[in-house]
């Protein structure tokens, strides 16, 4: 994760900035804002209230949201998509205002949303915009205790040399930006280990892909398999419904038959959504204390790629996997070189994924050049060569 180049904005700051942007960018919006809004948006900074008074802050949130909704309602009529003078900047400003007016707030207690009373929601909206200055920066969690704002960088590298073979900067949230999804994309556009049809037929032409558990989703493993790659990716640990009790691997899944058999030998059919409920079969089961605490008995959802995930967990227990997996640790040094400078984490200087992705590629190229020079890269008779031992 890289920290973004802008400050994370609170809800009040975002609403004020978004309304001001609409007033600047949308035709006739300045007059609309002055006419329908309760607050004065021509004054710089935040509205002047007693910030130590919770009631005053709550009232300000309601006023800001109501102002935003009022502006949007009027401009939806006066400045539709076909209005002369409306350009991309105007459309973006209106879209941003609509987004920030709803992403962080919810109706106050006892309100159905029509009374004009709003409060800041006690949750983080999925894919939340954290700044009106950089609308692609996102809030995410590296773990339950580590929260970060910015962008996510992905690297592919050769474990023996540490040379970076591919990289990509993405937003920190979104299904297309997960480690697993980007890992599959990078493997698919690999230019250094081309796979030919004869190689696929011989089953020796794919890559050997190493990664931590974030790169090993069921879909990613299926994609790697279909592309002819081998994986040395750590599986995610299984959770137990009861401490010390059974895991999903203690249940037998028969995909062709569409059934699941529990450790006690009871078999149930899976539903179309791949859920299975053992229900009353658990009532007198002697193994219940190891299986579930639910009054209605054990229920579970079987993953679409359950077979691949089970195979990955079985692979992780083999001596071959345990010997090969530490290879991935060598890439951590490369990651540290990309993410830090003189012992400090690098902070991005650009806005948006496009410019930051270009910066990441430039940094990766520079680090590769440094690594090659360290390995003896030299220029001989106009040709770059690596010195041999």
Regions found by a protein language model. Name each.
Residues 1-389:
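Anion-binding and metal-coordination hotspots
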């Amino acid at each position: 994760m890289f920290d973004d180049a802008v400050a994370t904005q609170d809800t009040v700051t975002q609403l004020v900035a978004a309304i001001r942007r609409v007033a600047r960018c949308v035709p006739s919006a300045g007059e609309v804002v002055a006419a329908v809004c309760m607050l004065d948006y021509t004054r710089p900074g935040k509205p002047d209230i007693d910030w130590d008074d919770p009631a005053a802050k709550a009232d300000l949130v309601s006023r800001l949201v109501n102002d935003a909704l009022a502006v949007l309602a009027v401009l939806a009529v006066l400045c539709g998509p076909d209005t002369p003078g409306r350009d991309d900047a105007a459309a973006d400003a209106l879209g941003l205002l609509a987004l920030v007016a709803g992403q962080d707030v919810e109706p106050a207690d006892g309100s159905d949303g029509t009374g004009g009373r709003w409060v800041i929601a006690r949750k983080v909206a999925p894919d939340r915009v954290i700044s009106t200055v950089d609308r692609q920066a996102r809030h995410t969690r590296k773990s339950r205790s580590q929260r970060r704002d910015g962008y996510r960088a992905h690297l592919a590298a050769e474990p023996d040399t540490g040379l970076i073979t591919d990289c990509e900067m993405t937003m920190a949230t979104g299904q297309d930006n997960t480690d697993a999804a980007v890992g599959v994309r990078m493997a698919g556009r690999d230019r250094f280990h081309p796979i030919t049809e004869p190689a696929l037929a011989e089953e020796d032409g794919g890559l050997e892909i190493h990664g931590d558990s974030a790169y090993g989703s069921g879909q990613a493993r299926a994609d790697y398999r279909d592309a002819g790659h081998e994986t040395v990716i750590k599986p995610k640990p299984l959770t137990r419904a009861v401490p010390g009790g059974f895991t999903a691997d203690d249940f037998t899944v028969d995909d062709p038959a569409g059934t699941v058999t529990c450790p006690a030998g009871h078999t149930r059919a899976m539903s179309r959504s791949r859920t299975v409920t053992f229900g009353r079969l658990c009532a007198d089961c002697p193994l219940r204390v190891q299986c579930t605490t639910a009054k209605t008995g054990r229920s579970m959802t079987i993953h679409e790629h359950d077979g691949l995930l089970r195979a990955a967990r079985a692979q992780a227990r083999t001596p071959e996997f345990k010997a090969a997996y530490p290879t991935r640790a060598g890439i951590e040094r490369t990651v540290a070189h990309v993410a830090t400078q003189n012992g400090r984490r690098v902070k991005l200087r650009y806005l948006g994924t496009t410019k930051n992705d270009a910066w990441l590629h430039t940094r990766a190229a520079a680090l590769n050049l440094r690594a090659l020079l360290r390995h003896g890269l030299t220029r001989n008779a106009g040709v770059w060569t690596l010195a041999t031992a």
